[in-house]
């Protein structure tokens, strides 16, 4: 049954692969192949993720399935791969929030944009999109006259990502408002996802 599920997966017949894997789990929930069956369910969803410009329902399904693998089989090789794929899905979902936020920002709908960028900062902290989200918040706050909020957000950006180009941009914006912040370093450090996983310092 698992071989059938794998064969369907290899031929990209994801619905049949999912059905076969689910059938195996229902018949053998504690079987030796259960970890792989759950993993197969997850990667069937993961492989169907589309670009950030379209609906991300598949990303949500993939995230749920990947989290189930890591929760049920935390010491398995499948869990380790699922954890890496989870980071990728989170980055995808954050990318969608950023795309919508930028759209609102261009239209001058600053409160709607702020909500999207705040979601990235609070719910997707380990993703590559956080530095830009913080900078876009600075832009948005300045656009509606919230200088204090912009200053606080720029300070958070500078503390957590001092060498990023996004902080340099925010620093320039705040200088234009007469607000002093720590100067960015001359060297523009690249952003490394795995170096920055964890809580932001506010």
Where are these regions (language model features)?
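Acidic, polar-rich low-complexity tracts and alpha-helical solenoid repeat scaffolds
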Residues: 1-202
């Amino acid at each position: 049954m698992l071989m059938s599920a794998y064969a369907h997966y290899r031929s990209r017949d994801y619905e049949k692969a999912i059905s076969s894997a689910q059938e195996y789990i229902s018949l053998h929930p504690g079987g030796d192949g259960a970890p792989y069956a759950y993993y197969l369910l997850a990667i069937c969803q993961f492989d169907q993720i589309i670009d950030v410009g379209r609906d991300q329902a598949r990303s949500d399904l993939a995230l749920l399935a990947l989290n189930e693998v890591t929760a049920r089989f935390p010491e398995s090789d499948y869990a380790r791969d699922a954890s890496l794929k989870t980071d990728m899905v989170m980055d995808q979902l954050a990318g969608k929030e950023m795309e919508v936020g930028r759209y609102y920002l261009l239209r001058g709908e600053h409160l709607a944009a702020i909500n999207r960028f705040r979601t990235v900062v609070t719910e997707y902290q380990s993703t590559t999109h956080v530095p830009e989200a913080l900078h876009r918040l600075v832009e948005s706050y300045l656009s509606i006259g919230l200088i204090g909020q912009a200053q606080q957000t720029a300070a958070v950006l500078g503390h957590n990502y001092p060498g990023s180009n996004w902080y340099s941009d925010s620093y320039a914006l705040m200088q234009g408002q007469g607000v002093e912040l720590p100067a960015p370093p001359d060297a523009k450090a690249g952003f490394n996802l795995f170096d920055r996983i964890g809580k932001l310092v506010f």
